[in-house]
């Protein structure tokens, strides 16, 4: 019934298995991949024909984690998986980026890649395995995919590169880098690092590329026995038509791309396109030498050619800069004084307002992952409204691009945040992109760094980011610093680097062509370093280090530690005690399992009141000390006084006053405030108090009678 094929190799000290022919046989390609005991199923389906009028390649990658893979049942009312989590979205993008450039130019059939995590061993992260499985499924599907690709995760532990470190090893690593590519070239890099130098980062990329070669060989081996017949797809030869269109539009496009202002340049390009359309599609003529779709493809191609020719021939870019110049920068902080921290970062025609907000442990984000539930105390959200590029568009929940850009900026900032013990706040940064002409994610990095410093968050060092580009024709190439949006779309590489003056904290690279050598990447990293240091200098004109004090409207958090056996006393039955403390003091209180107590309020008096209350619950009274208390009950033999948090003690009738007392209520009444001295504990551990050795007016001990009365009490 099944015609199965399997390939197994040893990779990074664990078995990697690729199997096809048994599951999802109606898909164009399906591969069950297992690494260690983590298993994923990747499927590929591509439509037989493109939709009429389709002028782009509609590729969708869906990565989905099933909770049963880790032996869990989903939370919530419906008890089933819902909308994609942030991690699922990020992994979908991680897989999409290296495979998208490898589909044959001109292929426009609707294509969907679905990767499902079926089993998670809680050791091997399924993201790299999912990339490998997707590549294998595409390679055997018959779809015009010029792969295969593979990916690898690279760690850096004790000065050594580590291939595919497991989940337990990652906290020790100074690097979390994912690299993907073909056997010849690197196509994609994504990383977070602890201020590592450029040569270490480049070494990690090359180490990863070398390490995944056995996987590519395994995919080829599987394809040799299991691949379907390649689809009969031949890309159109548009060279003759392109030459005709070029003759009409070249001069107009060259002039348009001399205009430095974005909107005016776009208007000139649109005018050139309209003029060419009139030439090739005259009114009233039904039969033309090319279709509208062919014209759109050719015009887009010519736009790229003219920009690229100009850069390589003259060294001048669209906006008149040379290859390494960064656009003018203006940095401002404190622009929204009622917020906890704020910044406006403007670089050329790219601008971001970033606002930092500080919260307590109650504000931490609860994340339910396959590996377990954990809390995240730093959030960075990136918003890209359509007005930022002068357009109308959909508003609402964030899209994949916004989630991806936010995470890239998060990775850049995260290594420079203070430890929770030093700064016990939850931090949320929100970047509102108000203008965009290239590299808005790196503007978010710069703006977030400024806003956090304005908020008084003691980051280790300021962080800046820069986007690099590449134009390559044959042996000639040009590396561009601080690319515009057009240079991103029309170039061969988008290379974002963020870090401090001492090293890189985040790196993201997407390469659209083969042949990017180690030498080119080295040039790009060095050029990026110069740009990054320049940007840090411009940012320092606004603020160079974190403010010494938090903003006026930010909450204050103080931390105290209590014995773990006292946690129950502070919380009380059903939370009664802690609710009372919160209600009466106004402070927010968070108690952790290790006895760490965080008390938060914007009012210092509320914090002190809560601290004093908690201290009174957990502290032990000391023999010989004097306390103020309240009479809670009277009896024939004395009075019970609440004197130390919830603790009560007995003042025997003989200890109420220096003179003989006939009746307890002659001296004290319930609710009366009194001063008492802790004399000790009886054989049953009961508290013994005395009022007569304390001056009830001043609360001071009556020294003259101290020795005699203490003897009497004993």
From Swiss-Prot:
EC number(s): the record gives 2.7.7.8
InterPro entries to which the protein is assigned, alphabetical: ExoRNase_PH_dom1 (IPR001247), ExoRNase_PH_dom2 (IPR015847), ExoRNase_PH_dom2_sf (IPR036345), KH_dom (IPR004087), KH_dom_type_1 (IPR004088), KH_dom_type_1_sf (IPR036612), NA-bd_OB-fold (IPR012340), PNPase (IPR012162)
Which residues are Mg(2+)-binding? 488, 494
UniProt subcellular location: Cytoplasm
Keyword hit for Translocase: no
Query: What would be an example GO MF term here?
Result: magnesium ion binding
Q: Which residues form the KH domain?
A: 555-614
Q: Which PROSITE patterns match?
A: KH_TYPE_1 (PS50084), S1 (PS50126)
SS bond partners: none
Q: Which cofactor does it need?
A: Mg(2+)
Tell me the Gene Ontology biological-process terms attached to this UniProt entry: mRNA catabolic process; RNA processing
- What family does the Swiss-Prot or TrEMBL record give for this protein? Belongs to the polyribonucleotide nucleotidyltransferase family.
Q: What does this protein do?
A: Involved in mRNA degradation. Catalyzes the phosphorolysis of single-stranded polyribonucleotides processively in the 3'- to 5'-direction.
**PANTHER family to which the protein is assigned, alphabetical:** POLYRIBONUCLEOTIDE NUCLEOTIDYLTRANSFERASE (PTHR11252), POLYRIBONUCLEOTIDE NUCLEOTIDYLTRANSFERASE 1, MITOCHONDRIAL (PTHR11252:SF0)
What's this protein's name? Polyribonucleotide nucleotidyltransferase
The opening ranks of the lineage are: Bacteria, Pseudomonadati, Pseudomonadota, Alphaproteobacteria, Hyphomicrobiales
């Amino acid at each position: 019934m099944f015609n199965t094929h399997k390939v197994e190799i040893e990779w990074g000290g664990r078995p990697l298995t690729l199997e096809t022919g048994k599951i999802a046989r109606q898909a164009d390609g399906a591969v069950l991949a297992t690494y260690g005991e983590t298993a994923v199923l990747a499927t590929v389906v591509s439509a037989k024909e493109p939709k009429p009028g389709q002028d782009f390649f509609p590729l969708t990658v869906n990565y989905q984690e099933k909770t049963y893979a880790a032996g869990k049942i989903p939370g919530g009312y419906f008890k089933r998986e819902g909308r994609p989590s942030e991690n699922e979205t990020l992994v979908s993008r991680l897989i999409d980026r290296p495979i998208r450039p490898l589909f044959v130019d001109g292929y426009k059939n609707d294509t969907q890649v679905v990767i499902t995590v079926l089993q998670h061993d809680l050791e091997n992260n399924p993201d790299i395995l999912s990339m490998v499985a997707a590549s294998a499924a595409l390679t055997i599907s018959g779809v015009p995919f010029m792969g295969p690709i593979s990916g690898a995760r690279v760690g850096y532990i004790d000065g050594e590169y580590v291939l595919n470190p497991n989940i337990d090893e990652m906290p020790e690593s100074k690097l979390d880098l994912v690299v993907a590519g073909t056997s010849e070239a690197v196509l994609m890099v994504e990383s977070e690092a602890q201020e590592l130098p450029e040569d270490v980062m480049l070494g990690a990329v090359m180490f990863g590329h070398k390490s995944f070669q056995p996987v590519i060989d395994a995919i080829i081996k599987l394809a040799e026995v299991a691949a379907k017949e390649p689809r009969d797809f031949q890309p159109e030869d548009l060279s003759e038509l392109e030459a005709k269109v070029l003759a009409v539009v070249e001069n107009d496009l060259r002039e348009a791309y001399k205009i430095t202002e974005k909107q005016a340049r776009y208007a000139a390009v649109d005018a050139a396109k309209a003029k060419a359309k009139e030439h090739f599609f005259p009114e009233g003529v039904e039969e033309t030498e090319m279709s509208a779709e062919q014209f759109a493809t050719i015009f887009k191609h010519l736009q790229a050619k003219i920009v690229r020719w100009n850069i390589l021939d003259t060294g001048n870019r669209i906006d008149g800069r040379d290859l390494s110049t960064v656009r003018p920068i203006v940095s401002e902080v404190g622009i929204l004084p009622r917020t906890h921290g704020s910044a406006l970062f403007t670089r050329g025609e790219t601008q971001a307002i970033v606002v930092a907000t500080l919260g307590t442990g109650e504000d931490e984000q609860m994340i339910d992952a396959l590996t377990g539930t954990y809390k995240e105390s730093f959030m960075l959200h990136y918003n890209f409204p359509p007005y930022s590029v002068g357009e109308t568009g959909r508003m609402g929940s964030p899209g994949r691009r916004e989630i991806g850009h936010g995470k890239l900026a998060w990775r850049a900032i995260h290594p420079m945040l203070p430890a929770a013990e030093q700064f016990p706040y939850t931090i949320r940064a929100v970047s509102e992109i108000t203008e965009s002409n290239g590299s808005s994610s790196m503007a978010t990095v710069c703006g977030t760094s400024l806003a956090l410093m304005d908020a008084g968050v003691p980051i280790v060092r300021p962080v800046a980011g820069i986007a690099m580009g590449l134009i390559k024709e044959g042996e000639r190439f040009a590396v561009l610093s601080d690319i515009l949006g057009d240079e991103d779309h029309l170039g061969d590489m988008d290379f974002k680097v963020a870090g401090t003056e001492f090293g890189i904290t985040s790196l993201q690279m997407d390469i659209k062509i083969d042949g990017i050598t180690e030498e080119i990447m080295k040039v790009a990293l060095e050029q990026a370093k110069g740009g990054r240091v320049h940007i840090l200098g411009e940012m320092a004109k606004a603020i160079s280090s974190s403010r010494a004090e938090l903003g006026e409207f930010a909450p204050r958090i103080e931390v105290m530690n209590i014995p773990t056996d006292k946690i129950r006393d502070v919380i009380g039955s059903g939370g009664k005690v802690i609710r009372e403390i919160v209600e009466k003091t106004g402070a927010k209180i968070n108690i952790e399992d290790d006895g760490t107590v965080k008390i938060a309020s914007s009012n210092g008096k509320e914090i002190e009141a809560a601290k004093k209350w908690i201290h009174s619950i957990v502290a032990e009274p000391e023999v010989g000390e004097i306390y103020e208390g309240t009479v809670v009950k009277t009896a024939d033999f004395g009075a019970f006084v609440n004197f130390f948090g919830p603790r009560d003690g007995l003042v025997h009738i003989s200890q109420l006053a220096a003179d003989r007392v006939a009746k307890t209520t002659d001296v004290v009444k319930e609710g009366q405030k009194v001063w008492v001295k802790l004399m000790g504990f009886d054989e049953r551990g009961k508290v013994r108090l005395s009022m007569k050795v304390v001056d009830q007016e001043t609360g001071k001990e009556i020294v003259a009678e101290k020795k005699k009365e203490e003897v009497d009490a004993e």
